[in-house]
Amino acid sequence: MHKLIAGVDEVGRGPLVGDVVTAAVILDPQNPIEGLTDSKKLSEKKRVALAQEIREKALYWNIGRASPEEIDKLNILHATMLAMIRAVEGLPVKPDFVRVDGNRLPAWNFDSEAVVKGDSLHAEISAASIIAKVERDNDMISLHEAFPQYNFAGHKGYPTKAHFEAIAEYGILDCYRKSFKPVKALLEEK
């Protein structure tokens, strides 16, 4: 039997709104997926197609999240680590080894390594990067459907000029990260 290696990555540390989303993926070495790379290097159409293929072909995968409230309470780094723990612990099997994109590891009891630029180096991290990105983008599309005036489908919650203009006109929703400086500053003005 081969070792079960999980790849983990996060999406959404920089946006002003929504969850930070992480994914853990254990790929099937007998069922390879072509075209895996860092999700940021792929078109949206290709990401969505690959995310579907990953969900179908991976041995196991799971999403972990931390809410805006948790981000505000813990800070973005600790909330991201919490979301990663949730992603891995939510897998139906315990991985033998975990590779995490970046330079930090969560405080957990898994044999693991942090890999800088891991989403370009290891297929399992690339797969995690892709399904986390598609999951978070879908969150923003749903939010856009509820609040089209903010154009969440366009800026995905990131601090763009158009996003700040929408906040100035329509206000700050509950899904905003109130500890993030631009949001905090706007709340203090009120």
Swiss-Prot record:
Subcellular location: Cytoplasm
Gene Ontology molecular function: manganese ion binding; RNA binding; RNA-DNA hybrid ribonuclease activity
GO biological process: DNA replication, removal of RNA primer; mismatch repair
Pfam families assigned to the protein according to its UniProt record, in alphabetical order: RNase_HII
Domain called RNase H type-2: residue spans: 3-190
Enzyme class (EC, first level): hydrolase
Residues that hold a divalent metal cation according to the record: D9, E10, D101
Keyword Phosphoprotein: no
Cofactor note: Manganese or magnesium. Binds 1 divalent metal ion per monomer in the absence of substrate. May bind a second metal ion after substrate binding.
Alphabetical UniProt keywords: Cytoplasm, Endonuclease, Hydrolase, Manganese, Metal-binding, Nuclease
EC number(s) reported in the record: 3.1.26.4
Catalytic activity annotation: Endonucleolytic cleavage to 5'-phosphomonoester
Cofactor: Mn(2+); Mg(2+)
Top-level taxonomic group: Bacteria
Any one GO cellular component localisation term in the record: ribonuclease H2 complex
Function: Endonuclease that specifically degrades the RNA of RNA-DNA hybrids.
Family listed: Belongs to the RNase HII family.
Protein name per its UniProtKB record: Ribonuclease HII
